[in-house]
Design a protein with these regions (language model features):
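Long, well-structured alpha-helical subdomains associated
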Residues: 63-107
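Amphipathic alpha-helical substructures
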Residues: 88-175
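Zinc-dependent metallopeptidase catalytic helix centered on the HExxH motif
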Residues: 1-82
């Protein structure tokens, strides 16, 4: 529609056209506009497998949307998106991945503009662009001038989206939910509040989706888009007639990469507070509390893996007989990406898991139990000598009674319960000393698990985890060092 009437030229022209085409498609049809034959050039089995899984699990009812998500929302695409600006992206270098980066970013930027401006202002912007440049080309500066002429501020929404490869990153406080006094008509009022911080130097947009209602009638709603300036926080308030059942942070294009499910507390419906209600967002000075803890996550530079198998490079061995046995796993920040449809992970791989530890992304490393020839290490520097308490993080779902053999199935399908774990082989290495640590994964709790207190010198220290384990899989998510004088 728009592309056949006017087109960008000059620096960033391809990216501008991508964004405007996506914006036009979303405005007119509420659907994405991008399609490329490169989407089917490889990994067709994986694409169709994930599409079937998406539809079966209710994540979407659109085959095209699922295919686009599978192709563009891959670790290697994100890595390239973070490594170069859209203006500097050269499609002739690896066309398939370049087009995927353009699709990933342009769709997100288009949604930011549409949701941030609203349909009326977005339509006015596109209409003015076509009317002024029909049959001619325009430059990026012309687009921004048209926006300024119509009192439309693009910079606070998307920053320098053409030249800057940096993204916002969102942190969220704990969620507070209370029942307020009923309104003047006797209707119940429930208030949910939380703080959101953009801890990066690029502005960003978020919204929250939430579920409320009765057991017989669940209702999904969403907040309006909320602007969060760079290195700033806002407080968000939601009002409903019932307590929330679910609450999700939905960033657009951010270092979080995925939607984040938030923990919703239980509400005491008998206690009713007479206090001011907040609906929407307002500036906040909230920041995560600083502690003396030293945490090493699987995405940190202090995490590494090694193999004792002769000549083996980092790779994933997909189960024999799997329909994906000919697929090449994508790489996720140095480790093969793991998906439950692959089967078992014979080498350390990285899995996205909503309850795992992480600042922006929530992931863990995992490997199938084996002969002790695969190792993961969490390394850091202790700032001073003394007694330190060590904890090991595991994100575990509640146990459900399983039939014989279902534990192994759970390990392969991504259901993380203590039943798939076993006795870990761990070694604490410091100042040339090697100390074995006992840890029974079957007895582990979800969250931080205490591994003991140790008298240690200042300097480098490493906790090494082996794949020799009595369970089905080994999980390496995060460790925490805490000075013992601060207690547990």
């Amino acid at each position: 529609f728009l592309h056949f009437q006017t087109s960008a030229m000059g620096e960033g022209a391809l990216a501008i056209n991508f964004v405007l085409d996506e914006l036009t498609a979303l405005l007119l049809t509420d659907k994405r506009g991008f399609f490329s034959a490169h989407e089917f050039s490889s990994s067709i089995n994986l694409i169709m497998g994930e599409t079937i899984q998406d539809i079966a699990q209710g994540r979407t009812d659109s085959v095209a949307e699922s295919i686009q998500r599978t192709i563009t929302n891959r670790p290697s695409v994100w890595d390239r998106a973070l490594g170069a600006s859209l203006a500097a992206l050269e499609p002739n270098d690896d066309p398939r991945r370049s087009l995927s980066v353009l699709a990933l970013k342009s769709e997100a930027i288009a949604r930011v503009i549409l949701d941030g401006l609203g349909r009326e202002k977005t339509g006015a912007l596109l209409s003015a662009l076509v009317n002024q440049y029909r049959g001619r080309h325009f430059h990026a500066a012309d687009l921004y001038q048209i926006a300024a002429d119509h009192d439309i501020e693009l910079e606070p929404l998307v920053g320098d989206w053409l030249h800057d490869s940096s993204l916002p990153g969102f942190l969220v406080s704990s969620v507070e939910s209370v029942r307020l006094t009923d309104d003047s008509q006797g209707n119940p009022r429930y208030q949910t509040r939380l703080h959101v911080r953009n801890d990066e130097s690029t502005p960003g947009l978020v919204r929250f989706s939430f579920q409320w209602g009765s057991k017989k009638k669940r209702i999904w709603d969403a907040t309006e888009p909320i602007r969060v300036p760079a290195n700033s926080s806002v407080e968000v308030g939601i009002s409903t007639l019932t307590p929330l059942g679910e609450l999700w942070l939905k960033p657009y294009l951010s270092l979080n990469r995925h939607d984040v499910k938030l923990r919703v507390p239980k509400v005491d419906s008998e206690a009713r507070l007479n206090t001011e209600i907040l609906v929407g967002a307002r500036p906040s000075d909230w920041k995560p509390r600083k502690t003396a803890d030293i945490v090493v996550d699987d995405l940190d530079s202090g995490f590494s893996v090694r193999s004792e198998r002769e000549g083996e490079a980092i790779s994933i061995e997909i189960s024999i007989g799997s329909p994906f046995s000919d697929e090449v796993a994508d790489m996720d920040q140095g480790l093969p990406e793991y998906k439950s449809i692959y089967g078992t992970a014979e080498a350390w791989s990285r899995s996205v898991y909503e309850d795992s530890w992480g600042k922006y992304r929530h992931t863990h490393a995992l490997v199938t139990s084996g002969a002790g020839d695969q190792h993961a290490a969490f390394s850091t520097e202790l700032p001073h000598e003394g007694r330190w308490r060590l904890s090991y993080y595991l994100a575990l779902s509640p146990e459900q009674k399983a039939k014989k053999g279902e534990e192994a199935e759970g390990a392969a399908t991504g259901r993380l319960t203590a039943s798939v774990l076993g006795e870990y082989q761990m070694n604490l290495i410091s100042n040339g000393d090697n100390q074995k640590i006992e840890f029974d994964g079957k007895a582990a709790a979800s969250g931080w698990n205490d591994l003991g207190e140790f008298q240690l010198p200042a300097g480098e220290i490493s906790l090494e985890v082996s794949n020799a384990n009595t369970g089905f899989i080994v999980i390496a998510d995060a460790i925490r060092w805490r000075p013992s004088t601060l207690g547990k």
